[in-house]
Amino acid sequence: MSAFKKLASDTALYGVSTILGRLLNYALVPVQTYAFGQPKQLASNVELYAYIALLLVLYTLGLETAFFRFAARRPETTPKVFSDTLSMVIVITSIATVVLLWLAPDIARWLDYPNQTMFIRWSALIVAIDAITAIPFARLRVENKARQFVKAKMINIGIVVALNVFFIIVCKDVYEGDYLPQLRPFVQYIYDPEIGPGYIFLANLLGNACYFWLLRKAFAGFRFQLDWPEIRTLYLYAYPIMLTGLANVVNNLTDRLFLRHYLPEGFYAGLTNEDALGIYGQCYKLSVFMALAIQSFRFAADPFFFSKAEDKNAPGLLARVTKWFIIVCVLIWIGVSLNLDVLGLLIGPKYRQGLGIVPLLLLGNLFLGIYFNLAFWFKLSDKTKYGTLITVIGAVVTLLGNMFLIPIMGYMGCAVAFLASSVVMTVICYVLGEKHYPVPYDVRSALGYITGAGLLIYASLQIDIPNPWIAVPFHLALFGLSAAVIAVIERDTIREGWARFRRSRKPAPVGSSQ
């Protein structure tokens, strides 16, 4: 039980900070969608941030996971492994960044954003900083320095949010003479209205640059070195992980990269393809609540389960953790899907027509989270080639799904393709895992909760309640009822867990050897 508590504690710490930070960041969605009322204005942001995520996987080469694995096996070599992995990332990142900065005008024309060369360059610098700081962040997780990790992330989010508000609201209003006329000469010096949505990239870049100061202790002891035998060992382990990560990114980002190009012109009356991409990209952010739960769990789970690799009780622990992970994610799926009428107010009016994609995206993320849990079998057994195979299959499903469904269903086709890919990956991973690393998962429980939640969401969406004073209490009551049903079903487990928790809180008897 102590191991379970440790994982829960770390997940809570990473989770509260990650959720709070991302919610602060999500507060920018109404700022951005109201400031840029035409969805096409944010189309390039949606697409370029997808490329940033793609490049980050290529730059880091899966070395974060390799660092976890080798640091857990040989803790005494952690400083050397840290230097080796970070040195590799620095070399790759430096070369790629120079190329991107040089080719930025050509890339802007190729992406059909010819006037946004500076946006490309800022994006290149953003991904460079993210890549270089990824290994120091991994070091904090390996060394169980969650508070330092959290502090750096929170300060970064605060800076990015503040700079967005400063550029997009304050500078814009002062420049246009709405208030504080005495500051207009200063604002004219730093603010150019032609940049517009580009200030989102600039704010991100300036916030990320602060990481080098915030993580200065995590860089301690780093020496640039290229120990080729060690690097080869790290690379051979990490390369399949990188391909897995790349396929995962393709699964998550193909929709935003394909939508503008595969959507027939005029598919949505009165909207351009750029408008459709802007709508999809902003509505997609409402699935952030599920992604946050998954990300928070993974921050704690990766180093935790690697440290338990040789423990004979690891399969049973993984099964229990996965069961409760699914329960929490199901409650998030229900809570968000039933309250889209309220959550939709967070985005500008012209963006709300895409809210129908959110329940499917949430379900896709739920299955993706289950897959990440199941995937520990090939990481713990050093059979990462299976992870590559599974995610490549998922990527193919995503690519083909978007190519065929976008022309027929528009951005709803993107959501369906993502869900299909996540389900396929989860099923394949489970079947292979049962052969190579059996884990006693409670499959009946998982399918029951997901099916029941899906039926509830579908039924509630068929009931149109235009009055929010009736709709909101009704939806909250349905959510509460769902939580109560789960509590009744799991009452024995909850009662046992509560009893163990209370016992663990009692002080040890005087004279006890414990």
Language model regions located:
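Membrane-proximal transmembrane or re-entrant/amphipathic helices at the cytosolic face
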Residues: 461-514
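Specific pore-lining/lateral-gate transmembrane helices of multi-pass inner-membrane transport
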Residues: 72-88, 279-391
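Transmembrane helical elements of multi-pass membrane transporters/channels
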Residues: 10-25, 199-215, 219, 228-303, ...
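Interhelical loop/hinge segments that connect adjacent transmembrane helices in multipass membrane
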Residues: 1-7, 175-199, 210-252, 300, ...
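Hydrophobic alpha-helical transmembrane segments
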Residues: 121, 151-220, 244, 392-398, ...
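N-terminal membrane topogenesis motif
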Residues: 1-26, 79, 83, 228-244, ...
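Membrane-water interface segments that mark the loop-to-transmembrane alpha-helix transition
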Residues: 9-21, 48, 60-105, 114, ...
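Signature of the first transmembrane helix
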Residues: 3-64, 92-101, 126, 160-161, ...
